[in-house]
From Swiss-Prot:
It is a multi-pass membrane protein. In Aspergillus, the biosynthesis pathway of the sterol precursors leading to the prevalent sterol ergosterol differs from yeast. The ring system of lanosterol in S.cerevisiae is firstly demethylised in three enzymatic steps leading to the intermediate zymosterol and secondly a methyl group is added to zymosterol by the sterol 24-C-methyltransferase to form fecosterol. In Aspergillus, lanosterol is firstly transmethylated by the sterol 24-C-methyltransferase leading to the intermediate eburicol and secondly demethylated in three steps to form fecosterol. Disruption phenotype: Results in decreased hyphal growth and virulence; as well as to hypersensitivity to azole drugs. Deletion of both erg24A and erg24B affects ergosterol biosynthesis and leads to the accumulation of the intermediate 4,4-dimethylcholesta-8,12,24-trienol. GO terms for molecular function: Delta14-sterol reductase activity. Belongs to the ERG4/ERG24 family. This is Delta(14)-sterol reductase erg24B. GO terms for cellular component: endoplasmic reticulum membrane. One of its GO terms (biological process) is ergosterol biosynthetic process. Its EC number is 1.3.1.-. Its main location: endoplasmic reticulum.
Length: 518
């Protein structure tokens, strides 16, 4: 595999092959940019169909997940298991569809609170101390400057959540607000991400043409200015859209917001963990206890997010920042898809509390550890060899030299498969889903013998058992497909770059991701 700097945990972007692994990348040569743009669109034959399908289809899918796996009738809603007798009226009743219809999915007050969260994150970016870093060299010449303090911002916000929970318990206003207005919070984020995507699309037409004065180092993204309006809006025309806030008494770097980097590392990632915590609070409010499964899942996800935030500067060497424009794809993915799809396992467990027990915990930990050993071992091995090939830990590794001067490892982890780190990354993703077990439940109403009041309880029935896995294991399947797509794109890029050397390399390292299988 090509030697790249992939020292941190992978950050997974929702749709494209983004956030899958950290990699250093040479600045794009103009000839390569022209070749890349004319070579193909990312969705090839399905430009408008693919873009339209994602822009309108994925938000609908997210709403469907939220309604079809619920705390009113079950997960999935019982009528979905009997399609021959399915009726819209019955389904609306089972999923809790609001009486006011689709307009009830939006609430102005909720949207204002969500905007307040975005504003808080923005102000923390500006005023909190942080590390200033230069990005990679741009094709238009020069390097952009970035200020990073996402980890500090997250620590302060989570500390505030901890104080609120200490004072008010699980009735802390933030926890009840997020659960009671969950659908409206989704809508608010969807509106915000769409508005940002429209803004950066329209603003991209003011990017200076080659040869014109360009003091802000603005440039269009390769493949993002095809002339197809819908596709360009979706994929992103401008590479690094930025705004300068009119805030006095702070440095220019501090008040300059790189919209793409800010969206990728701030509101959505931290929002994901905040939603997990609100789900834990809901479980305690409902049942009076917290299960090991929801704690374990939240711990895995929190570690993943905090690791990404702590290593925030590593984002500058990813394909996202170097090559991909910022459009609806990343805007929606970062601010809607990631937090509201990725918290689904803990949301499920908050309604159907499942105890893993010691043996279950050990199994999940063992699977996660196996994935981590593969992922971290492969990346560390590559980084050490790239930094110092004479390091005693890697000097025994075999490699081939290419005409470009790069060295491709053919032994050790990278002799097992050309993208062995993807296998470890995918196995680690299982840890989010396995704690939900064989998912599925129905909401059963019964009389509380002590109080005489009607109560609802989530019970796993033979009919519902297993069907909930469509929702709780969707992430694992989706991420696997994402990695396969990324692997194919990597293979094409490496074949173009290395030519005959890549053919020689693949003849020596035959497996792509899973040794001996694929």
């Amino acid at each position: 595999m090509k030697l790249r700097n992939t020292g941190q945990m992978a950050f997974r972007s929702p749709f494209s092959n983004l956030h899958v692994r950290r990699s250093s990348h040479k600045p794009s040569h103009p000839a390569f940019v022209r070749q890349n743009r004319s070579m193909h669109y990312y969705f090839r034959d399905a430009l408008n169909i693919g873009a339209f399908g994602i822009i309108f289809g994925l938000p609908c899918l997210l709403y469907a997940f939220t309604f079809f796996c619920n705390d009113i009738s079950g997960c999935p809603a019982p009528s979905l298991l009997h399609p021959s007798t399915l009726s819209i009226d019955k389904l609306e009743q089972e999923v809790g569809w609001p009486e006011d219809g689709i307009k009830a999915l939006y609430d102005t007050q909720v949207t204002m609170w969500v905007l307040s969260y975005y504003l808080l994150s923005l102000l923390m970016q500006v005023f909190l101390p942080g590390t200033e870093v230069e990005g990679t060299e741009l094709a238009c010449g020069g390097r952009l400057k970035y200020k990073f303090n996402a980890f500090l911002s997250a620590v302060l916000i989570l500390s505030g959540c901890a104080v609120g929970t200490y004072l008010y318990g699980t009735e802390f206003a933030l926890w009840t607000f997020l659960w009671d207005n969950y659908v409206q919070v989704i809508t608010a984020n969807l509106i915000i991400c769409t508005a940002i995507a429209i803004f950066v699309y329209l603003r991209s037409f003011s990017v200076p043409a080659p040869g014109q004065l360009n003091p802000e180092l603005r440039q269009l993204a390769p493949g993002g200015h095809t002339g197809n309006v819908l596709y360009d809006f979706f994929i992103g025309r401008e590479l690094n859209p930025r705004i300068k806030l009119p805030i006095p008494f702070v440095g220019e770097t501090a008040r300059t917001i790189d919209i793409k980097v800010w969206c990728e590392m701030r509101p959505g990632l931290l929002g994901w963990i905040i939603l997990d915590l609100s789900n834990i609070a809901h479980q305690y409010r409902t049942y009076g206890y917290i299960t090991d499964s929801i704690v374990l899942t939240t711990a895995f996800q929190a570690f993943y997010v905090l690791d990404a935030l702590y290593m925030e500067p590593a984002l500058l060497t990813t394909m996202d920042v170097i090559m991909d424009g910022f459009g609806f794809m990343l805007s929606f993915g970062d601010m809607v898809w990631v937090p509201f799809l990725y918290n689904f396992q803990t949301r499920y467990l908050s309604v159907y509390p499942s105890e893993l027990g010691l043996s279950g915990i050990l199994i999940v930990l063992a699977v996660t550890a196996a994935g981590y050993v593969i992922f971290r071992g492969a990346n560390n091995q590559k980084n050490r060899f790239r930094t110092d090939p004479n390091d005693p830990r890697v000097k025994h590794l075999k490699y081939i030299e290419t005409k470009t001067g790069s060295k491709l490892l053919i032994s050790g982890w990278w002799g097992c498969a050309r993208h062995i780190n993807y296998l470890g990354d995918w196995i680690m993703s299982w840890s989010y889903c396995l704690p939900t077990g064989v998912a599925g439940y129905a909401i059963i109403e019964s009389i509380n013998p002590a109080s005489g009041e009607m109560q609802k309880q989530a019970v796993q029935t033979p009919e519902s058992r297993g069907w909930g896995m469509i929702f709780t294991y969707f992430y694992m399947i989706y991420f696997g497909v994402l990695l396969l797509h990324r692997e194919r794109r990597d293979e094409e890029k490496c074949k173009r770059k290395y030519g005959a050397d890549w053919n020689r390399y693949t003849s020596l390292v035959r497996s792509r991701i899973i040794p001996g299988i694929y």
